[in-house]
Amino acid sequence: AGAAEIFGLYLTEDLPLDAAEVAAAGSTRAALTAMIAAAAGQLYARTPSTAYAVATVDSSMVVGSGASANLSTHTLYRGDFASGAVIRNIVDRAKKAAIKEQLQALTAGADASSVGIGTRHLLEAVRAEFEDQVDLPPLPDIEDALTVAGVRGRLVSVEPPR
């Protein structure tokens, strides 16, 4: 519910929304709820395409005591690194894409009154937010994500997903 609440801070009923989505949903509020659910679902999806980093952790009890290492790998996903700032960036990207689409419609002489923010803008913004970041997340962020996931131990290595 946290991500949906944050999306809801930035996606409000006073924004121009895709008219077809509002009509299909039956109301502006219902359209926003569906858009937010789709964006949050994409942000937190745990699929091969949303893998963001692979961490190898040594969870042996005493490091350096001669005990054999107990190595395990953990895939971290985009959602593991989501924050309020990331969600705001996603919404800002979606807004810019919708504005650009509206300007293109106006330039082409088309009726742009039905053009507004839609699910497609949000889903593309989720994808772009993480694909534009070419570097792996900083080690403290990776350690925090592992801790939140309940993984304990010494971080041995971090690699991009394959």
What are these regions (language model features)?
Residues 1-87, 96-105:
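Conserved C-terminal "switch" segment of AAA+ ATPases
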Residues 61-162:
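C-terminal engagement/docking regions of AAA+ P-loop ATPases
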